[in-house]
A protein has these predicted regions:
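Bacterial N-terminal signal peptides that target proteins for export
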Residues: 1-9
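Bacterial N-terminal signal peptides
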Residues: 8-17
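Acidic, polar-rich low-complexity tracts and alpha-helical solenoid repeat scaffolds
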Residues: 18-231
């Protein structure tokens, strides 16, 4: 046994390393990475051609495939960005929001990060404004309350303790406040804003909203008691 161990120890380090790379579980070699990048760029060019030809559906598919299969390709971030834009233009709001979200999660160092974040925030705020107006008018909304809140939470998570996050958190409180049966959630949302960003421009109004909700709840309680007394 000892002679065998000695013989193994005498093998050159390069031979051992080469042997260890013989399985499929090893890291991707530089040549493979370059080949994948080249393939990704070729796919991106096909997506651009479809885009320029007005074949929106095909362009969306190819842009998404480029960014998903070849995330390290030079144009992968641009592919995801353009996919999101086309989805938004096509009216597929939830899909567009998700594509923007994938961009923000994958390419935080991109020069277009702030542009994408602002676009995503605008989409979430627009969805929320429609939800609030519909709640007061008694209409049904296209997106559920849960989905709209989730959109705003994602926006806030990409820019914690920023003005964008403050606006998003305040809007979450407004959404819940517009629902008569969501007062606890509204209070919690407004309080979270005040606790995490007490110096934000939205904090004073959030604190005021908490007091207002408590007053409205007390008035409703008194009215209910009065109705019981009259019964």
């Amino acid at each position: 046994m000892i002679p065998q161990l000695c013989a193994l120890a005498a093998l050159p380090l390069t031979a051992i390393l080469l042997a260890s790379c013989g399985t499929d579980d090893g890291p991707m070699l530089a040549g493979n990475t370059q080949a994948a990048s080249a393939e990704g760029e070729a796919l991106y060019q096909k997506a651009k051609q479809a885009d320029e030809s007005g074949k929106t559906g095909r362009a969306i598919k190819l842009y998404g495939e480029t960014a998903t299969r070849f995330p390290f390709a030079p144009s992968a971030d641009e592919a995801r960005f353009r996919q999101a834009q086309l989805l938004e233009q096509d009216g597929r709001i939830e899909d567009a929001f998700e594509a923007y979200d994938q961009f923000l999660a994958r390419y935080p160092g991109s020069s277009q990060y702030l542009t994408v974040l602002n676009r995503q925030a605008s989409m979430a705020q627009s969805a929320a404004e429609g939800d609030v107006k519909s709640s007061f008018l008694g209409l049904k909304t296209k997106l559920s309350l849960e989905k709209t809140v989730a959109m705003l939470e994602k926006v806030a998570s990409h820019a914690p303790r920023s003005r964008t996050a403050s606006k998003a958190q305040f809007t979450i409180g407004e959404l819940y406040q517009a629902k008569r049966n969501k007062t606890k959630e509204a209070i919690a949302a407004f309080r979270k804003l005040v606790a995490e960003q007490p110096d934000s421009p939205e904090a004073p109004e959030a604190l005021f909203r908490v007091g207002l909700i408590y007053m409205e709840e007390a008035e409703r309680g008194n009215q209910n008691q009065a109705n019981l007394d009259l019964a």
